[in-house]
Regions:
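Non-catalytic linker/capping segments at the edges of enzyme domains
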Residues: 1-47
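Hydrophobic beta-strand-centered segment that forms part of the acyl-chain substrate-binding groove
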Residues: 67-101, 106
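C-terminal binding/interaction regions
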Residues: 107, 112-114, 124-133
């Protein structure tokens, strides 16, 4: 896997909840390229729990949305905004896990709409969450 350099790091005013490294409230995702996929390895934190030791579903949705936007950035060399997101929560994610892995890839491009699929895996490699996003690329 090859690390993707964040092109906005150091830009004045850059404070993305998903990927800004200096946003104290944010999730601070980093990304890697692995063939057709973009990958993120992320450490759950207790402040992002919903129920005791369980990663909040809204935070999972943020992670999925962010990685899909980075797929558009990396693979199409443009930015995109989410127009639709369908998410299935299959298994809870433990906030005590050492890490989780997210993987996403483009499934289809229709004019200015990009369909991206993403999966979130727990530390044991089990699929916990699946999303399909439609993003409008700019």
């Amino acid at each position: 896997m090859k690390k993707i350099i964040n092109p906005w790091k150091g830009l004045e005013g850059y404070n993305c909840f998903g990927c800004a490294p200096n946003n104290e409230a944010g999730v601070k995702m980093e990304f890697y390229e692995d063939g057709d996929e973009v990958v993120s390895i992320w450490k759950p934190r207790p402040e992002y729990q919903g129920w005791i030791d369980t990663l909040h579903g809204g935070i999972q949705a943020v992670l999925m949305d962010e990685i899909c936007a980075w797929v558009v950035l990396r693979k199409l060399q443009t930015t995109g905004v989410t127009s639709k997101m369908e998410t299935r929560y299959r298994k809870s994610v433990d906030t005590k896990d050492s890490h989780i892995v997210l993987r996403a890839s483009i499934k289809e491009v229709k004019r200015n709409i990009v369909i991206v699929e993403a999966k979130l895996y727990n530390k044991d490699g089990e699929v916990c969450t699946e999303s399909v996003l439609s993003l409008i690329h700019i």
